[in-house]
Amino acid sequence: MQKKYYELFFIVEEQYKNLFLDFAFDLGIEAIEEKDNGVYIRSHESLEEFSWALEIFAQKLTTTFNLNHKIISNLSLVEKENKDWIQEYKKGIKPILVDNVYIHTTWQEEKKNCINIKINPALAFGSGHHESTYSCVKFLQKFSKSKLRALDLGCGSGILGIIMAKFGCNVEICDTDELAIDSSLENARLNGVDFHKAWCGSIDKANGLYNLIVANIIADVILILEKDIKNHLEDNAILILSGILDKYSTRIKEKFQDLELIDEMQINEWCSFVYKNNKKG
């Protein structure tokens, strides 16, 4: 084991965090940890070039979203004494119980009398602890039913798609990051379920109508995809929207006011909404 390693830390606005995580994965970064309201990246190789690339990426996002403030802050790069970070990482991840769904890692035991969801968090995009994912898991236990045609839009690690499949839905998944698709398919295999279709891209590549769509993605993307989402809803279909910071909730409600809002939940600053496709007028 090498004696030293490099640690890069930065704080990023929550709604843009996944963009930065995707960026890091695309550049071959593997040791990523979300902690202390920020992101830690560790490597035995120098991270100076990546730190520079990160700042350029942040500047481009600031321009793209026409922001008047910085997306990232507290950027620091230090050299530290080495540890067995794999074991440290494993110690830091706890299983999560949401009603009757128990989400755990590949190295943790299953829970009796629960629907067990096994996730390899090293593959990509989280292990179910985020507030928006928690809300989706609660809602999916209520609205997932056998034989429904369902779509996990922005699937990430595949947790939500796997849950729908466990409830008997015919599940399709999509994500704009190919790594997320690969990770979701691997996690599905770990859980003994199959997705009927999986593609790299968004809902514009979907064919036909769905009885259930879950979109746990940031508000900006939901607003962009609003028409495409509605165009793929079957009559009386259920739509679950999550990953929405409370400051965007009014805009989301205005955009989807032609659908019937039947349930909602807020945990800390994160909002989730459930709509039924009973279009008004």
Swiss-Prot record:
<dbReference type="GO" id="GO:0005737">
    <property type="term" value="C:cytoplasm"/>
</dbReference>
<dbReference type="InterPro" id="IPR029063">
    <property type="entry name" value="SAM-dependent_MTases_sf"/>
</dbReference>
<protein>
    <recommendedName>
        <fullName>Ribosomal protein L11 methyltransferase</fullName>
        <ecNumber>2.1.1.-</ecNumber>
    </recommendedName>
</protein>
<comment type="similarity">
    <text>Belongs to the methyltransferase superfamily. PrmA family.</text>
</comment>
<dbReference type="InterPro" id="IPR050078">
    <property type="entry name" value="Ribosomal_L11_MeTrfase_PrmA"/>
</dbReference>
<feature type="binding site">
    <location>
        <position position="216"/>
    </location>
    <ligand>
        <name>S-adenosyl-L-methionine</name>
    </ligand>
</feature>
<dbReference type="GO" id="GO:0032259">
    <property type="term" value="P:methylation"/>
</dbReference>
<keyword id="KW-0489">Methyltransferase</keyword>
<comment type="function">
    <text>Methylates ribosomal protein L11.</text>
</comment>
<feature type="binding site">
    <location>
        <position position="175"/>
    </location>
    <ligand>
        <name>S-adenosyl-L-methionine</name>
    </ligand>
</feature>
<dbReference type="GO" id="GO:0016279">
    <property type="term" value="F:protein-lysine N-methyltransferase activity"/>
</dbReference>
<dbReference type="InterPro" id="IPR004498">
    <property type="entry name" value="Ribosomal_PrmA_MeTrfase"/>
</dbReference>
<keyword id="KW-0949">S-adenosyl-L-methionine</keyword>
<feature type="binding site">
    <location>
        <position position="154"/>
    </location>
    <ligand>
        <name>S-adenosyl-L-methionine</name>
    </ligand>
</feature>
<keyword id="KW-0963">Cytoplasm</keyword>
<feature type="binding site">
    <location>
        <position position="133"/>
    </location>
    <ligand>
        <name>S-adenosyl-L-methionine</name>
    </ligand>
</feature>
<dbReference type="Pfam" id="PF06325">
    <property type="entry name" value="PrmA"/>
</dbReference>
<keyword id="KW-0808">Transferase</keyword>
